[in-house]
């Protein structure tokens, strides 16, 4: 059964995308669809360009060829003011959390509201408390970032990401560096916020278990190509050796354990003085 996402149902559509850094081809003519109201995951090993894809979707980088549309708008043809308006509708949870260290939890969440709206402080207070309540940290509003655990900081960053009620959120490695309890809390939050707020979520991750638990659809990327795509169940049953190696964490396979080198015995017996 083919469960591929129809472009008609997509909030974000990536068509025939190619992108390089220097001589390294990051994406080679790939196409992806991100369905409205769903959680879509981009998976693959480190260095495959997952975070780069988020930057391309956000208009921070320009593709060599292809197009990216968000809510029907071609991201890379927008004027600066139009791109600015679009970005206000796109929440972002950075891998680092990126909290402003000299601001309290409350002021971190209030920051986008103060920057991008003309709401009175009384309404901003109400909205901030609502967002903090949603992530379970309303009682931490007066703490400073250096008083937070890693999991708490990630949840505060999520509250800030939804402050402007975006249509979508992009998550850059949300589970990295988190303990099992924090991972479980983030899994619950991402799924529940997506459902309750009607969000479209894009998750970049190499954490297989957590991501598969909440994703509606998964793309697996390697060496610039999509090597697997489908529902978590379809990915689990994929006959691709590469997908199976990634999902099971096997040490060797299509992604080799050894970095390319000349023959081992020849290398040992070589009389060359160069390493």
Where are these regions (language model features)?
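Helix-to-loop junction immediately C-terminal to a conserved catalytic motif
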Residues: 58
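Conserved ABC ATPase "signature" region
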Residues: 73-74, 121-139
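Conserved ABC ATPase signature
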Residues: 144-148, 152
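A short, proline-enriched helix->beta-strand linker immediately N-terminal to the Walker B motif
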Residues: 163-167
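Catalytic Walker B motif of ABC-type/P-loop ATPase nucleotide-binding domains
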Residues: 169-172
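ABC ATPase nucleotide-binding domains
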Residues: 248-275
């Amino acid at each position: 059964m083919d469960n591929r996402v129809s472009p008609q149902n997509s909030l974000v559509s990536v068509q025939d995308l190619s992108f390089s850094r220097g001589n390294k081809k990051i994406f080679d003519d790939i196409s992806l669809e991100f369905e409205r109201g769903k959680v879509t995951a981009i998976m693959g090993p480190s260095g495959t360009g997952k975070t780069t894809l988020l930057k391309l979707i956000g208009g921070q980088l320009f593709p060599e060829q292809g197009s990216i549309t968000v809510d029907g708008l071609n991201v890379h043809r927008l004027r600066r003011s139009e791109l600015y308006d679009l970005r206000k509708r796109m929440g972002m949870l950075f891998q680092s959390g990126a909290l402003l260290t000299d601001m309290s939890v409350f002021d971190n969440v209030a920051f986008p509201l103060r920057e991008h709206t003309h709401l009175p402080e009384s309404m901003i207070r109400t909205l901030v408390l609502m967002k903090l309540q949603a992530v379970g940290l309303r009682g931490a509003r007066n703490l400073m970032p250096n008083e937070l655990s890693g999991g708490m900081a990630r949840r505060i960053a999520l509250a800030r990401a939804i402050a402007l009620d975006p249509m979508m959120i992009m998550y850059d490695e949300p589970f990295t560096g988190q303990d099992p309890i924090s991972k479980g809390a983030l899994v619950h939050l991402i799924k529940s916020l997506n459902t309750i707020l009607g969000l479209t979520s894009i998750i970049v991750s190499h954490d297989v278990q957590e991501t598969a638990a909440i994703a509606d659809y998964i793309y697996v990327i390697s060496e610039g190509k999509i090597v697997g795509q489908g529902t978590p169940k379809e990915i689990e049953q994929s006959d691709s050796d590469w997908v199976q190696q990634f999902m099971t964490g096997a040490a060797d396979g299509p992604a080799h354990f050894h970095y390319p080198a000349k023959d081992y015995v020849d290398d040992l017996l070589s009389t060359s003085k160069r390493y």
